[in-house]
């Protein structure tokens, strides 16, 4: 099995509802280690930069507005097949389609306010981690 890193965001809706601890518990219970974490309030420029690949999509403005509406938690997770493991814990993007017991089924209200983000590939994870964390901020856990 491959040890990977992935990037995760707990979005403003879930932060506002105090779900941070419950979501972190899901990560750790699944064997993912949190090796970097911080709470930030994205600026419009930061949100537009992070979601630049969606800039031509009709939902881009609403996405940026939502992601800047309150603080978020950003974290880097490490573990076996971390990208896939994290996406399985999150569940389907639309919480109405998410499997029971997943983060989005349990904590999200709608497809627009769906509680969390997870990298969709190792390449995306590397780019997304680097967007928010310097190498010095990553703390691999060896114990």
From Swiss-Prot:
Record has Metal-binding as a keyword: yes
Cofactor: Mg(2+)
Subcellular compartments: Cytoplasm
Catalytic activity field: a 2'-deoxyribonucleoside 5'-diphosphate + ATP = a 2'-deoxyribonucleoside 5'-triphosphate + ADP; a ribonucleoside 5'-diphosphate + ATP = a ribonucleoside 5'-triphosphate + ADP
Taxonomic superkingdom: Bacteria
PROSITE patterns documented for this protein: NDPK, NDPK_LIKE
Keywords recorded for this protein, A-Z: ATP-binding, Cytoplasm, Kinase, Magnesium, Metal-binding, Nucleotide metabolism, Nucleotide-binding, Phosphoprotein, Transferase
EC class name: transferase
Major place of residence: cytoplasm
CDD domains the UniProt entry points to: NDPk_I
Active site residues according to the UniProt entry: 117 (pros-phosphohistidine intermediate)
Classification via PANTHER family: NUCLEOSIDE DIPHOSPHATE KINASE, NUCLEOSIDE DIPHOSPHATE KINASE DDB_G0292928-RELATED
Entry similarity comment: Belongs to the NDK family.
Protein's recorded name: Nucleoside diphosphate kinase
Source organism (scientific name): Shewanella pealeana (strain ATCC 700345 / ANG-SQ1)
Lineage, uppermost ranks: Bacteria, Pseudomonadati, Pseudomonadota, Gammaproteobacteria, Alteromonadales
């Amino acid at each position: 099995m491959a040890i990977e890193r992935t990037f995760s965001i707990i979005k403003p809706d879930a932060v506002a509802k105090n779900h941070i601890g419950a979501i972190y518990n899901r990560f750790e219970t699944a064997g993912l280690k949190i090796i970097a974490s911080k709470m930030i309030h994205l600026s419009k420029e930061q949100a537009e930069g992070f979601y630049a690949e969606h800039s031509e999509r009709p939902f881009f403005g609403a996405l940026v507005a939502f992601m800047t509406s309150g603080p978020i938690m950003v974290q880097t997770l490490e573990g076996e097949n971390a990208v896939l493991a994290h996406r399985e814990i999150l569940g389907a993007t639309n919480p109405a389609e998410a499997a029971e017991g997943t983060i989005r089924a349990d904590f999200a209200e709608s497809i627009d306010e769906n509680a969390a983000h997870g990298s969709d590939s190792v390449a995306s994870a590397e780019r997304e981690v680097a967007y928010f964390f310097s190498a010095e901020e990553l703390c691999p856990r060896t114990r």
